[in-house]
Curated annotation (Swiss-Prot):
Annotated Gene Ontology cellular component terms: cytosol
Named cofactor requirement(s): prenylated FMN; Mn(2+)
UniProt GO molecular function: 3-octaprenyl-4-hydroxybenzoate carboxy-lyase activity; gallate decarboxylase activity; metal ion binding; protocatechuate decarboxylase activity
Binding positions for prenylated FMN per the UniProt entry: 168-170, 187
Residues the record lists as binding Mn(2+): 165, 233
Keywords: Decarboxylase, Flavoprotein, FMN, Lyase, Manganese, Metal-binding
Keyword Kinase attributed: no
Protein name: Gallate decarboxylase
Note, other: Gallate decarboxylase does not form a complex composed of Lpdc, LpdB and LpdD. The term subunit has been used in reference to the three-gene operon. Gallate decarboxylase LpdC is the only protein required to yield the gallate decarboxylase activity.
Enzyme Commission designation: 4.1.1.59, 4.1.1.63
GO biological process: ubiquinone biosynthetic process
Catalytic activity: 3,4,5-trihydroxybenzoate + H(+) = 1,2,3-trihydroxybenzene + CO2; 3,4-dihydroxybenzoate + H(+) = catechol + CO2
PANTHER family per UniProt: 3-OCTAPRENYL-4-HYDROXYBENZOATE CARBOXY-LYASE-RELATED, FERULIC ACID DECARBOXYLASE 1
Amino acid sequence: MAEQPWDLRRVLDEIKDDPKNYHETDVEVDPNAELSGVYRYIGAGGTVQRPTQEGPAMMFNNVKGFPDTRVLTGLMASRRRVGKMFHHDYQTLGQYLNEAVSNPVAPETVAEADAPAHDVVYKATDEGFDIRKLVAAPTNTPQDAGPYITVGVVFGSSMDKSKSDVTIHRMVLEDKDKLGIYIMPGGRHIGAFAEEYEKANKPMPITINIGLDPAITIGATFEPPTTPFGYNELGVAGAIRNQAVQLVDGVTVDEKAIARSEYTLEGYIMPNERIQEDINTHTGKAMPEFPGYDGDANPALQVIKVTAVTHRKNAIMQSVIGPSEEHVSMAGIPTEASILQLVNRAIPGKVTNVYNPPAGGGKLMTIMQIHKDNEADEGIQRQAALLAFSAFKELKTVILVDEDVDIFDMNDVIWTMNTRFQADQDLMVLSGMRNHPLDPSERPQYDPKSIRFRGMSSKLVIDGTVPFDMKDQFERAQFMKVADWEKYLK
């Protein structure tokens, strides 16, 4: 018998009986700000303003205005849960994904009869078609520009179909058949394809796939140079599952869709057409972004003309709170893999592990664990930090620690800054570098002298490693190891 294909429902079946990882509620919730407001207290975490915490994924079964739709949020809002869903140690997920990138399993196309994503089909030509009534996209806060698709995997291809790619973008529902999509300039392959179509003044066919195996979602967030132009990140998910991701031909567009997605929106990125992101609200805000602040509404988003909405029977709408721990998992773990790949190529064996903690939203900060064999390795840790900035341009802060420090425990990491760090010796500041435009401190008015354009930044390296010739003076207190210590709690 063939193995059951991986999809969101198979993953949920594996975790649904664990109350630490999954909870359902039948209490009615309004998708307009209330749903995200509720989950903020239960399990959002990340850079969300306190009070918040790490908690279970939540399935909301009674969504106001959408009687036939369930909404899932927080599925990846725990690194331990991601490890459980990937059947792998959460502490070495970066290494695991690095191996997956190097050994991709290409997706395969199946017949429509084998694609549950096409169980139910609505076309834009149908009477009364309105994506705002078909797709239960939540609004994160009352200030949002509108309902957002926050974890939709966009599938697109080059004009000659020789290359295809998947990426995740924020997309706001603007009208009955219109989405605004933010494609950050530079680095995104979907953006390169869209530019190609726009120069030819042709609409670009795409599909937006929602409600997926988290292996697909997390794999889709890899960026260059780890996944170069022409690398389809669905191969990463295939490697994680040792099973090809299944695709199906679109119903109304000449493009592939993910065959086991809960929802698929088909349509076209329209050439030379733009829309004001907050055209329906005029709040000046988009939605909460990973640094923990509301993003500014973009005055000129690219436009997606929707031609169809398809979904599974009893479909699950999946959503992510922008600054939550879920984003940390989605962006941070692939970034760890990217850093490990580049650093190990240049200085093999010297960086034992990497962690992008919630404080940086998965993008802005990394903690690197360093191994020194002898005095010739002194200084190699700072070269590793510089390589990390090369691997991921949006990285802002690197903290270097020794192997006796738990990089997943921020108290242990901060301890190194208090006992293994002198600011006048162990601090590196790198000015005038490129970073992420969503960091509000990277605006010219913050520092007109050094920040000429938005998205420029000074980067920081904190070297909390012990000088090799002083290792014996920094040995931590060694307590007795007691194998059966847990019996004292019974």
